[in-house]
C-alpha cells in the first residue's frame, strides 16, 4: 500500500488546485481557515468539548487544538500557525512532526490573540472560513469575505470526491468501528446494560465519548424504535430481545458510520426479519453504480421494504407496488436510505448539483432523504435501510381505508423489539462499488 505520506502529498496538491480555482473564481488572494475556539457553558468557566472546523481538518489532521490558523493561496506551501501556549493548567499538544508536516509550513503560535501580527498586512482580499466571524472582523477581514457562500459551496461540492488519502483514512476509521461493533455485540450477548455496552464500544475503538463522530446509538429492545436514541440506560432490561447499535469512529478527522442489529434469539420472526433486511441491503448495494441518482436507490429500497412487509405478513392483501404508491412503506422506514460521509458524518453537498451550489431538494414524498446527487467515482455514502415499529407513525394508519391491510396483531408482537437498521459505508468507483464495511467481514 502506498504510504500515507505520499497519499497526503497528492491530497494537498488536489486541495491546492481547488483553492486556486475558488480564489480565481471569487477574486480573492488567499483563504484564512480557523480551527475554531473553545466556547464556555453559559454562566460558567467550563468549555464545551472542542469540535474542529471541518474545512480546517480537510487540510491537516489536527482535530483537538483550538486557536490554530491556516493560510492557503493555492500556490505557496500552506502555512499553519499551531497554537502552542505556555500553560500549566491544561494539556498542550506539542508542535506536530508527522507524515504530513513536510507539506505544510508549521509555525508555533504562543498566544491565541497573536495571530494578527503574523498575517499579511493587506487583508482586504483574504477570505475567512471559520466559526467565529467576530474574530475575523477584529483581524480586519472584510465582512463580505467572512464565510463567503460561493467559496464554501465550491469547496463543499468537491469534498464529495474523496482523494486516495481520504479513502485510506476512512478505511482505517472502518477498522476501528468494526472492532467496536464486535465488542458491543459480545457485551450485549453477555447481558450488559446500554451504558456498559457503550463503554465496551469506546474501549475497543480507543475513543472517548467526545471523540466519536456522533453520539453512539446503543438501543436495546423497544429503544431501537427511536431513530437517534442516545439515553444509555444504566440497568439492563429484564428480558433482552434486540440490540441496535449505530456507532462510528474517526481517524485523522474522517468518519465511519456503521449500524448493526441483533436478535437475542435466532428462532423468532424478528430474527428472520433482521436477516431479510440484511440480505436486501446487500442486494441493493450489488446493483449500485456510477451515473445513477441516489434517489433511485432510495425508491428501490421502498420496493424491497414492501416485499418484506408482504413476506412477513405485516401488510396483507395488497401488492408491493400499491404499498409503495400509497406510502404504506413510509411508517416502517421513515428516514432516507443514507447520506454522504467524510469529514462529517452527514457530509456536505448532498443536494448540490454543481460547484455553484445549485440545490435539488429531496422528493416531497421522502423529505428526510439527505442526498439527491448522481453517483460519481470518489463519492462515499452510507446505505442504511431499516424497518421500525414506531407507534406515532403507525397511529394514523389505524383508521381509514388502508387500516385493514395492516396486520396489527403481528405489529404489536414486533413492537417490543423496536426496529432494525443495517448500515454499511460504500465507495463509488468507476467500474465497481467498494463496501468498506463488509470488506472487514462485519456480518
From Swiss-Prot:
From the UniProt record, which GO molecular function terms apply?
A: aminopeptidase activity; metal ion binding; metalloexopeptidase activity; phosphoric triester hydrolase activity; proline dipeptidase activity
Q: Which reaction does it catalyse?
A: Xaa-L-Pro dipeptide + H2O = an L-alpha-amino acid + L-proline
Q: What class of enzyme is it?
A: hydrolase
CDD domains, per the entry = Prolidase
Indicate yes or no for the key word Hydrolase.
yes
Q: InterPro entries in the record, alphabetically?
A: Creatin/AminoP/Spt16_N, Creatinase/aminopeptidase-like, PepQ_N, Pept_M24, Peptidase_M24B_aminopep-P_CS, X-Pro_dipept-like, X_Pro_dipept
Binding locations of Mn(2+) 1:
257, 339, 384, 423
Q: Which UniProt keywords apply?
A: Dipeptidase, Hydrolase, Manganese, Metal-binding, Metalloprotease, Protease
The cofactors required by this protein are: Mn(2+)
Where is Mn(2+) 2 bound in this sequence?
246, 257, 423
Question: Would you tell me the Gene Ontology cellular component terms?
Answer: cytosol
Pfam families reported in the protein's UniProt record: PepQ_N (PF21216), Peptidase_M24 (PF00557)
Describe how the cofactor binds.
Binds 2 manganese ions per subunit.
Instruction: Name the Enzyme Commission number(s) assigned to this protein.
Output: 3.4.13.9
UniProt cross-references to PROSITE patterns, sorted A to Z = PROLINE_PEPTIDASE (PS00491)
Task: Give any single GO term for biological process.
Answer: proteolysis
Under NCBIfam families, the record lists: PRK13607.1
As for what it does, the entry says: Splits dipeptides with a prolyl residue in the C-terminal position.
Stored HAMAP family: X_Pro_dipeptid
The family classification in the record reads: Belongs to the peptidase M24B family. Bacterial-type prolidase subfamily.
Protein name per the record:
Xaa-Pro dipeptidase
Origin organism of this chain? Escherichia fergusonii (strain ATCC 35469 / DSM 13698 / CCUG 18766 / IAM 14443 / JCM 21226 / LMG 7866 / NBRC 102419 / NCTC 12128 / CDC 0568-73)
**Which gene underlies this protein?**
pepQ
Amino acid at each position: 500500500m502506498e504510504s500515507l505520506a505520499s497519499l497526503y502529498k497528492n491530497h494537498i496538491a488536489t486541495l491546492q488546485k481547488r483553492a486556486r480555482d475558488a480564489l480565481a473564481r471569487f477574486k480573492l488572494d488567499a483563504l484564512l481557515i480557523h480551527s475554531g475556539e473553545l466556547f464556555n457553558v453559559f454562566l460558567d468557566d467550563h468549555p464545551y468539548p472542542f469540535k474542529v472546523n471541518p474545512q480546517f481538518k480537510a487540510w491537516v489532521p489536527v482535530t483537538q487544538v483550538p486557536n490554530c490558523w491556516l493560510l492557503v493561496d493555492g500556490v505557496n506551501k500552506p502555512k499553519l500557525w499551531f497554537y502552542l501556549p505556555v500553560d500549566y493548567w491544561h494539556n498542550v499538544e506539542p508542535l506536530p512532526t508527522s507524515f504530513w508536516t513536510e507539506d505544510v509550513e508549521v509555525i508555533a503560535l504562543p498566544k491565541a490573540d497573536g495571530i494578527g501580527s503574523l498575517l499579511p498586512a493587506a487583508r482586504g482580499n483574504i477570505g475567512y472560513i471559520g466559526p467565529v466571524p467576530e474574530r475575523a472582523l477584529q483581524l480586519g477581514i472584510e465582512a463580505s469575505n467572512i464565510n463567503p457562500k460561493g467559496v464554501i459551496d465550491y469547496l463543499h461540492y468537491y469534498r464529495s470526491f474523496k482523494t486516495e488519502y481520504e479513502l485510506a483514512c476512512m478505511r482505517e476509521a472502518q477498522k476501528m468501528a468494526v472492532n467496536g461493533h464486535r465488542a458491543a455485540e459480545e457485551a450485549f450477548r453477555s447481558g450488559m446494560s446500554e451504558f456498559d455496552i457503550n463503554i465496551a464500544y469506546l474501549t475497543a475503538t480507543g475513543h472517548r465519548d467526545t471523540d466519536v463522530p456522533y453520539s453512539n446509538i446503543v438501543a436495546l429492545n423497544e429503544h431501537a424504535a427511536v431513530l437517534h436514541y442516545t439515553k444509555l440506560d444504566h440497568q439492563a432490561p429484564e428480558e433482552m430481545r434486540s440490540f441496535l447499535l449505530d456507532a462510528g469512529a474517526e481517524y485523522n478527522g474522517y468518519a465511519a458510520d456503521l449500524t448493526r442489529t441483533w436478535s437475542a434469539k435466532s428462532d423468532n420472526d424478528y430474527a428472520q426479519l433482521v436477516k431479510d433486511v440484511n440480505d436486501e441491503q446487500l442486494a441493493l448495494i450489488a446493483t449500485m453504480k456510477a451515473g445513477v441518482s441516489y434517489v433511485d436507490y432510495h425508491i428501490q429500497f421502498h420496493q424491497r421494504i414492501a416485499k418484506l412487509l408482504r413476506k412477513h405478513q405485516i401488510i396483507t392483501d395488497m401488492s408491493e407496488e400499491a404499498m409503495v404508491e400509497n406510502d404504506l412503506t413510509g411508517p416502517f422506514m421513515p428516514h432516507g436510505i443514507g447520506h454522504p460521509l467524510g469529514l462529517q458524518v452527514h457530509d456536505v453537498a448532498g443536494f448540490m448539483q454543481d460547484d455553484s451550489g445549485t440545490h435539488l431538494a429531496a422528493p416531497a414524498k421522502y423529505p428526510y432523504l439527505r442526498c439527491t446527487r448522481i453517483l460519481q467515482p470518489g463519492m462515499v455514502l452510507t446505505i442504511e435501510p431499516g424497518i421500525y415499529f414506531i407507534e406515532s407513525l403507525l397511529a394514523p394508519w389505524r383508521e381509514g381505508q388502508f387500516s385493514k391491510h395492516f396486520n396489527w396483531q403481528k405489529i404489536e408482537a414486533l413492537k417490543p423489539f423496536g426496529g432494525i437498521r443495517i448500515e454499511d459505508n460504500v465507495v463509488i468507483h468507476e467500474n465497481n462499488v467498494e463496501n468498506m464495511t463488509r470488506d472487514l467481514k462485519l456480518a
